């Protein structure tokens, strides 16, 4: 009852008003899976290719009709009649048929949409939730945990039209007992942050990921106003809630220097910028820093990893959910945490392989959204089904972000004590 009988691809709209690929996979017995590919703003140069049409007369060149045609044409022809339960086999057929290193023939957006839709259809055919099916595909059946949210409540960099260099300032409700409580804590801090910003005469418009995007006097001021909001919400910073940042440093890396417009265009070397960030960690309980250097700055990352020792030095643009690059990073002692993004690699099977490699090496794996999202909440199921421990899916506004939090609430309700929320224990160096 899990044989594929029909595949449909279509062009839909993401949270930034740009087109993306949605796919449906239909099986015998009437089972259907549907999924959509997300899209990033600050992207690593070695990510799998997101295929765009380039026709400037339509969606300013960002249409995805070529990728949709690949879904409805060669991909559908190759997969009809195949067993959807064989996820690795389905993904291999698409990857081999594409035949390129970075999925540039069909587009990672086409392959990923079908890959995820196939997993959803197979789960439906097996009569189980997606997270349970993912746990089985991961080789860890019945082993679940609820992830600690990393809530991006101040947006900067490529995610906002403001003067803040660092792209994400996040809170982690590590003191919560359940993910539902963690989400409530995050919501309360988010609303108190609005009051803090308004009292200072600052803008409370939001960025791509639902966090506030005010103009600030410095990057450190973002941490200061968050600390004020945490206190106003009745929580203790460092105990109930810790902080995290995504620098997206590749976006302000110019001619071998890190140039911060928000710090008066001050330029830093790799070591100087590492120490700049270190000073922030001395002032605030920042327990995770992502993309603290440019993706090409391997020597700088090695220094940063050794310098910080216990705290997670996460890599997103550098590793791009790619096991070949991650393996090299592990061998060279680069970072100790990886961001997991489906569309950076382009299939569920390859995503699961990256999570396994990271965990086997003692790295933490943070399941992450992209700045261009849809209502698709698959990453919530991925985080629970792989017991990843942490999830990044934006702030407490915009339905494209909240959809993932709501799915986590539903999953926790269904699993109960089978999926513990481990809070601080999930954060490297904080257990």
Swiss-Prot record:
SUPFAM superfamilies with a match to the protein in the record: Enolase C-terminal domain-like, Enolase N-terminal domain-like
Localization: Cytoplasm; Secreted; Cell surface
Cofactor note: Binds a second Mg(2+) ion via substrate during catalysis.
A GO BP entry: glycolytic process
Metabolic or biological pathway, per its Swiss-Prot or TrEMBL entry: Carbohydrate degradation; glycolysis; pyruvate from D-glyceraldehyde 3-phosphate: step 4/5
Keywords: Cytoplasm, Glycolysis, Lyase, Magnesium, Metal-binding, Secreted
Residues involved in Mg(2+) binding: 246, 290, 316
Protein family (similarity comment): Belongs to the enolase family.
Quaternary context: Component of the RNA degradosome, a multiprotein complex involved in RNA processing and mRNA degradation.
Name under which the protein is recorded: Enolase
């Amino acid at each position: 009852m899990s044989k594929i009988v029909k595949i449909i691809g279509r062009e839909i709209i993401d949270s930034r008003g740009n087109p993306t690929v949605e796919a449906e996979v239909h099986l015998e017995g009437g089972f259907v899976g549907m999924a959509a590919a997300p899209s990033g703003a600050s992207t690593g140069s070695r990510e799998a290719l997101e295929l765009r049409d380039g026709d400037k007369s339509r969606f300013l060149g960002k249409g995805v009709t070529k990728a949709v045609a690949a879904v409805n044409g060669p991909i559908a022809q190759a997969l009809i009649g195949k067993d959807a339960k064989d996820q690795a086999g389905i993904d291999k057929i698409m990857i081999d048929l594409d035949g390129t290193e970075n999925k540039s023939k069909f587009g990672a957006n086409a392959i990923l949409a079908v890959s995820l839709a196939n997993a959803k259809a197979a789960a439906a055919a097996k009569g189980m939730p997606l997270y349970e099916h993912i746990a089985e595909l991961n080789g860890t059946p019945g082993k679940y945990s609820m992830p600690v949210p990393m809530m991006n409540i101040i947006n900067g960099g490529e995610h906002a039209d403001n003067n803040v260099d660092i792209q994400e300032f996040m809170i982690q409700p590590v003191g919560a007992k359940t993910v539902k409580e963690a989400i409530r804590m995050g919501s309360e801090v988010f609303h108190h942050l609005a009051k803090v910003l308004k009292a200072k005469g600052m803008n409370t418009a939001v960025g791509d990921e639902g966090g506030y995007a005010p103009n600030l006097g410095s990057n450190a001021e973002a941490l200061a106003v968050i600390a004020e909001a945490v206190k106003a919400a009745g929580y203790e910073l460092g105990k109930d809630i810790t902080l995290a940042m995504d620098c997206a440093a590749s976006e302000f890396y110019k001619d071998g220097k890190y140039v911060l417009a928000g710090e008066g265009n001050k330029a830093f070397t790799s070591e100087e910028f590492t120490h700049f960030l270190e000073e922030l960690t001395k002032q605030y309980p920042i327990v995770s820093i992502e993309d603290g250097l440019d993706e090409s700055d391997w020597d700088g990352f090695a220094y940063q990893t050794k310098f910080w020792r216990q705290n997670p030095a996460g890599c997103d643009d550098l590793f791009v959910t790619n096991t070949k690059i991650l393996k090299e990073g592990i061998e060279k002692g680069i970072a100790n945490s990886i961001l997991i993004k489906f569309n950076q690699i382009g299939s569920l099977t390859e995503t699961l392989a990256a999570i396994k490699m990271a965990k086997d090496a003692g790295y933490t794996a943070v399941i992450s959204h992209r700045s261009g999202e849809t209502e698709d909440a698959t990453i919530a199921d991925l985080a629970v089904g792989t017991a990843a421990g942490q999830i990044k899916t934006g702030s407490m506004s915009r339905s494209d972000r909240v959809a993932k939090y709501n799915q986590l609430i539903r999953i926790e309700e269904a699993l109960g004590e089978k999926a513990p929320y481990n809070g601080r224990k999930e954060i490297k160096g904080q257990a």
